[in-house]
Amino acid sequence: MRDEQATGAAITFDRVEKSFAQKGGAPVMALSDCTLTVEPGAITGIIGRSGAGKSTLLRMVNGLERPTGGRVLVGGRDVGAADGAELREIRREVGMIFQHFNLLASRTVFGNVALPLEIAGRPSSEIRTRVADLIARVGLEALADRYPAELSGGQKQRVGIARALATGPKVLLSDEATSALDPETTQTVLRLLADINRDLGLTILLITHEMGVVRDIATHMAVIDGGRIVEAGPTYDIFVRPEHPTTRSFLSGVTGVTLPAFVASRLRPAPPEGPSQEVIRITFAGRHATDPMLARLTGELGIAVNILAGAIEEIGPHPFGNLLVSVETPRGAEARAYLERHQLLTEVLGYVG
């Protein structure tokens, strides 16, 4: 049965709750009041620390876990209420890749990719054609007859991706799919997922504890903390204006911009007596990311600026940068007002004497 109001979304988490019974004790609440909409064709990353509830949330999409409250809808169909034939139909539309690959050691690359099609009862001729196409898509044509023990970690994950695509799903779930890979292989797998998303229009929902993965691939993101979704939206918007402390904590490890230790150790929440400097974070976003605003600030207002740290990178197609600076405290408000008039974001981090 479809929910007509939710059929426009690929996946809808509607006030989802999940608790687990404990022998001789009160139930443990894993998820509480989680609401999130995953748009068709988006790559949505759910980030959270270990134990935050992200894997539990992901496993509800294909019915591996059932909510104890709320609903999980895939294409408007309630996964938690589905059973038998309807649940099998939903699962055919949802592929999944795993952190540890889950390949059958006794089957070749071809055999692993073919397995879902064999289970679905597809004709042999269709299986051969489909598997050959998928193996080519993930760049493993030369390894079709190899066994998992003969493959690298990145190659195993490519097999996992091809297998997940075998039945032509509309949604692909990624459960920490790159966390067991080295950085270079991680980037290769992320590029492959981005290509699949672009070429097939596939909706991808991934979970990770690495903000770098979200930055590199996700169009949208959600932050989960203590079983609750505390922030969600377009990835670029959240990187530019993070609101929740958990989000800020994750971002501090990926933007590459932290205060030097000799400044951080002296930072105070209020100006000390005597001469002091106001420490400011400046966020450069979009078309303003490469503007020479500090030179203009000094030239037009005569405010001396000390640069403490900085970096610029890309979030999707958009440039994004952070700069940590200090100015004389009496002129801090004037400097911030000037920068904000020119569409930059500022935040006072504290003061040093």
From Swiss-Prot:
Gene3D superfamilies for this protein: 3.30.70.260, P-loop containing nucleotide triphosphate hydrolases (3.40.50.300)
Q: Does the keyword ATP-binding apply?
A: yes
Q: Which InterPro entries match?
A: AAA+_ATPase, ABC_transporter-like_ATP-bd, ABC_transporter-like_CS, ACT-like_dom_sf, MetN_ABC, MetN_ABC_transporter-like, NIL_domain, P-loop_NTPase
Query: What is the superkingdom listed in this entry's lineage?
Result: Bacteria
Assigned GO CC terms: plasma membrane
Q: Which reaction does it catalyse?
A: L-methionine(out) + ATP + H2O = L-methionine(in) + ADP + phosphate + H(+); D-methionine(out) + ATP + H2O = D-methionine(in) + ADP + phosphate + H(+)
Query: From the Swiss-Prot or TrEMBL record, what is one GO molecular function term?
Result: ATP binding
Q: What is its EC number?
A: 7.4.2.11
EC primary class: translocase
What's one Pfam family the UniProt record gives for this protein?
NIL
Compartment(s): Cell inner membrane
Task: Report the membrane topology from the UniProt record.
Answer: Peripheral membrane protein
- Keyword Transport recorded: yes
Domain (ABC transporter) spans 11-251
Positions of ATP binding: G48, R49, S50, G51, A52, G53, K54, S55
- Key words of the record: Amino-acid transport, ATP-binding, Cell inner membrane, Cell membrane, Membrane, Nucleotide-binding, Translocase, Transport
Q: Cite the CDD domains for this sequence.
A: ABC_MetN_methionine_transporter (cd03258)
Q: What is the purpose of this protein? A: Part of the ABC transporter complex MetNIQ involved in methionine import. Responsible for energy coupling to the transport system.
Q: Which family does it belong to?
A: Belongs to the ABC transporter superfamily. Methionine importer (TC 3.A.1.24) family.
Subunit details: The complex is composed of two ATP-binding proteins (MetN), two transmembrane proteins (MetI) and a solute-binding protein (MetQ).
- The protein's name: Methionine import ATP-binding protein MetN
Organism encoding this protein: Cereibacter sphaeroides (strain ATCC 17023 / DSM 158 / JCM 6121 / CCUG 31486 / LMG 2827 / NBRC 12203 / NCIMB 8253 / ATH 2.4.1.) (Rhodobacter sphaeroides)
From the broadest rank down, the organism's phylogenetic lineage runs: Bacteria, Pseudomonadati, Pseudomonadota, Alphaproteobacteria, Rhodobacterales
